[in-house]
Amino acid sequence: MSELFSRRLALLGEPANQSLLRHCLHGIERECLRVDAAGELARTPHPAALGSALTHPYITTDYSEALLEFITPAETDSAATLAALERVHRFACAKLDGEYLWSPSMPCPLPAEEDIPIARYGNSHIGRLKHVYRKGLALRYGKTMQCIAGIHYNFSLPEELWPLLQRAEGDVRGVRGVRDFQSERYIALIRNFRRYSWLLMYLFGASPALDKSFLRGRPHHLQELDAETLYLPWATSLRMSDLGYHNNAQADLTPCYNDLASYTDSLRRAVSTPYAPYAAIGTQRDGEWLQLNTNVLQIENEYYSTIRPKRVTASGERPIQALVARGVQYVEVRCLDIDPFLPLGIDLDEARFLDAFLLFCALEDSPCLAAGECASCTGNFLKVVKEGRRPGLHLQRHGQPMPLAAWAGELLERLQPLAALFDRAYGGDGYEKALHAQQAKVADPELTPSARLLATLRERGESFRAFALRQSLAHAESLRARPLGEEERQAFEAEARASLAEQAELERRDTGSFDDFVAAYQASIQGDGG
């Protein structure tokens, strides 16, 4: 344990600071495909009973019209976050007529590319911009790839923590420097996340198999489990592997996480720099928009990463602008698979473990990534998603081979005092129990969700698609068996109606042409200070 880590732990453990961790904020976004009773992709529009996907605060769509996304408010207790996620699931399940939420991350059998519906957001300029952006994604990466679903976990440390740490560490930049100190600490968290996120893939990866149709006949290195199912025997998360997808445009885009400025500069260049193959296609054909621009990235969010530094944006503000103007506010973890054994795709044990893991990443010493270390982090991550449960698997640590099981055990041991801090802050032993559940998975890989999924397929002689549909129907039944109370149901219905009215108002208020709107949106990223 580093001296710096010990000092920070001791500071948080002081009686006056013990309650601080109760002010962490936790939010969850869960994506899931809508399917029909046969487990085929729903071709119906986003249900009006769920409100407007453009303006509803808790229910939207991601890439496809059939790819729902449920969003919780930021809560000070992970248990409250999970409760909010469950409420929105119960509401949605009650409103889906003959349709179901697909339980795993990897998609159901998909129709031909041209028949996968891209999400629509109405006729306002901002609604059309979101649709054209998704058309651009189809052009660049194909629609099939965009139908993979995941869990995003948003986490922030208490605002009061930063000046406390800053003073304790002798940082004399004063009040104005707190924002920069906070951003530096979040970027340091992200560096450590890059070093250790392979552990999350081992513990929570839940996509070792997929439906054969997903690969569309492309060459691959997967094995056949049955006539409909492909898999890798030791894989944890095929979702986070390359699966044969290579996007050359993003290959050279490796934002440096050594400071916020280099990260935002790297993204700004990517959203401003033309990429020849995209330029050859152009933005419009016969007056129809094909993509927002021909740059490496159309917008910042197109960059695929396992974790992002975030700041809540004002209306009309872009993510880079918000980060440059006000610094990092929270992180968004983006590498989590949906657990198909759980109705919500995530449970409280996982959320609590993530809290402790992210606090560890924030407090642990985090030097800048040395030459070659980035490649080593990526290598470890890819190794674990493809063969994380292989007996005797070694990863690279400081240029030396290290057994995964030993390193994982060591990391979990170091999380013990952080789990204890959270339990002291909240009362009870929920965090310690969550940690023990993960230690059991390291001791016995058969307890991991990836191993459990493959064991279930083998024991039942079941294909991936049959298993996934069975789980989807079972989860729908359990959620529908506990309908919302009348008051909660009415509140959700009112929210849905209000969102539809808000979308209509946006459409009514729009002025000028869509072309001018896109041009102004593009221009907003150029020449920002920072």
From Swiss-Prot:
**Any one Gene Ontology cellular component term annotated for this protein:** cytosol
Q: Does the keyword ATP-binding apply?
A: yes
A Pfam cross-reference name: Glu_cys_ligase
> What GO molecular-function term can you cite, just one?
metal ion binding
Superkingdom to which the source organism belongs: Bacteria
- Which InterPro entries does the annotation name? Gln_synth/guanido_kin_cat_dom (IPR014746), Glu_cys_ligase (IPR007370), Glut_cys_ligase (IPR006334)
Has UniProt tagged this entry with the keyword Repeat? Answer: no
Gene3D superfamilies, per database record: 3.30.590.20
* EC class: ligase
Give the UniProt record's GO annotations in the biological process aspect.
glutathione biosynthetic process
Entry's EC annotation:
6.3.2.2
- UniProt KW keywords: ATP-binding, Glutathione biosynthesis, Ligase, Nucleotide-binding
Catalysed reaction, written as an equation: L-cysteine + L-glutamate + ATP = gamma-L-glutamyl-L-cysteine + ADP + phosphate + H(+)
Describe which pathway this protein belongs to, using the record's wording: Sulfur metabolism; glutathione biosynthesis; glutathione from L-cysteine and L-glutamate: step 1/2
Matching entries from PANTHER family are given as: GLUTAMATE--CYSTEINE LIGASE (PTHR38761:SF1)
Q: Which family does it belong to?
A: Belongs to the glutamate--cysteine ligase type 1 family. Type 1 subfamily.
- Alphabetical list of NCBIfam families matching this protein: glu_cys_ligase
Protein name stated in the entry = Glutamate--cysteine ligase
Species the sequence originates in: Azotobacter vinelandii (strain DJ / ATCC BAA-1303)
